[in-house]
């Protein structure tokens, strides 16, 4: 008897051959390879990481890992392990757990995972969590003693490798913020407020040098329609669906954003998120903002399980025409946000939904904003500067040694090869 899942997957690949065939075909082939667990149960794959300053590159890695199995279990490294191996994390474990749990490709999360997979922890993964394969990117993960953090998994023949997402890393994001503070001392309390003001206004003694440095990145993010399709949901609101709309910059997408989106999603059937343009954010919050570009911010929001659709480059003001076009039932805004004084603005961006009686202010569960993260960097920027210098060297080595990645199907090589990198 034919497998109905097989026919469904094949139909998915066939239906979109005239448009974005690579996405559907990749999903189909990945599913073909991940089937066939000896016990007949779902294939469970494991990926771990620090997930500090979580970004769309992390999310894309989790998406690729999930495509190699039926269930994705994610280990989040403890604060103590990160400090011992890399330096202080910007976001503590509780915030990193919120971020990882919110990624729509994640099925289960293990807190306080070790930085290196020990024999004991590997056995726990295989026996207790029923993990079939351990996944990691093709960028090296080297311990302080120079050994491979995944050596045991490779030796056991249970290791699979995916391609890292180029153009972004936590090191790069922290580096973007450090550009404004690299020549300042944080020993003087007075300097803290000065640095924060400079971050908002863009004024610094050597601003021209800072701008020049920001153009010399090792790798640059190049958005493609294929990546957006991979992150998008294949759903639209029904005719009677209650559509909830929330907008913002969503810069340095963090736990505060996630928790607000979770509450917003609970108020309706479909959550539509508007992502403001780079120009709008800069005009309202200073020339150094946003830290992440419009497409980078959009991908981070799209990866969130509470989000159904995004408007890439949403208008600052919510108009009546926009409400009608998207059939919006409710417009919401959090109490903890960068622009909480919007009602004092000459042109209140929410004037129309307020007049229509469809506007609601949400009590934000967490007192975290993008500025909160920037202040953490500013307060301890010397430690992050040292960490970045060390990490940047390894990233440079990775990019110098990388080989061309083809868009052709990567599944001709056996899935059970330890060295093959899967691109999905």
Language model features by range: what are they?
Residues 2-424:
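Nucleotidyltransferase catalytic core that binds NTPs
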């Amino acid at each position: 008897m034919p497998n109905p899942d097989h026919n469904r997957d094949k139909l998915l690949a066939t239906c979109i051959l005239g448009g974005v065939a690579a996405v559907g075909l990749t999903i189909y082939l990945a599913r073909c390879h991940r089937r066939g667990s000896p016990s007949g149960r779902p294939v469970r794959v494991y990926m771990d990481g620090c997930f500090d300053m979580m970004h769309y590159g992390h999310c894309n890695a989790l998406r690729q890992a999930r495509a190699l199995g039926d269930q994705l279990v994610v280990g989040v490294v403890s604060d103590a392990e990160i400090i011992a191996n890399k330096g202080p994390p910007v976001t503590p474990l509780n915030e990193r757990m919120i971020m990882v749990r919110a990624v729509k490709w994640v099925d289960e999360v293990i807190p306080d995972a070790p930085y290196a997979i020990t024999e004991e922890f590997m056995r726990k993964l295989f026996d207790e969590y029923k993990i079939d394969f351990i996944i990691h990117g093709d960028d090296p993960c080297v311990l302080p003693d120079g050994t491979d953090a995944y050596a045991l998994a490779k030796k056991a023949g249970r290791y699979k490798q995916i391609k890292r997402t180029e153009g972004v890393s936590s090191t790069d994001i922290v580096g973007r913020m450090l550009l404004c503070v690299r020549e300042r001392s944080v020993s003087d309390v007075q300097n803290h407020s000065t640095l924060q003001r400079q971050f908002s206004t863009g004024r610094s003694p050597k601003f021209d040098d800072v701008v020049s440095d920001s153009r010399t990145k090792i790798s640059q993010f190049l958005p493609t329609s294929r990546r957006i399709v991979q992150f998008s949901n294949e759903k639209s609101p029904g005719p009677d669906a209650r559509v909830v709309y929330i907008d913002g910059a969503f810069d340095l997408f963090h736990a505060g954003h996630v928790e607000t989106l979770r509450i917003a999603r609970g108020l309706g059937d479909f959550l539509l998120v508007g992502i403001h343009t780079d120009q709008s954010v800069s005009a309202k919050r200073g020339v150094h903002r946003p830290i992440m570009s419009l497409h980078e911010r959009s991908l981070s929001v799209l990866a969130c399980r509470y989000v159904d659709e995004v408007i890439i480059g949403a208008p600052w003001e919510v108009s009546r025409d926009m409400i009608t076009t998207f059939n919006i039932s409710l417009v919401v805004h959090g109490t903890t946000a960068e622009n909480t004084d919007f009602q004092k603005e000459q042109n209140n961006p929410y004037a129309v939904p307020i007049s229509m009686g469809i506007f609601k202010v949400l009590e934000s569960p967490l007192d975290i904003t993008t500025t909160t993260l920037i202040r953490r960097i500013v307060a301890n920027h010397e430690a992050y500067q040292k960490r970045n210098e060390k990490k940047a060297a390894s990233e440079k080595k990775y990019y110098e040694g990388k080989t061309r990645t083809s868009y052709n199907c990567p599944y001709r090589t056996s899935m059970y090869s330890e060295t093959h990198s899967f691109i999905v």
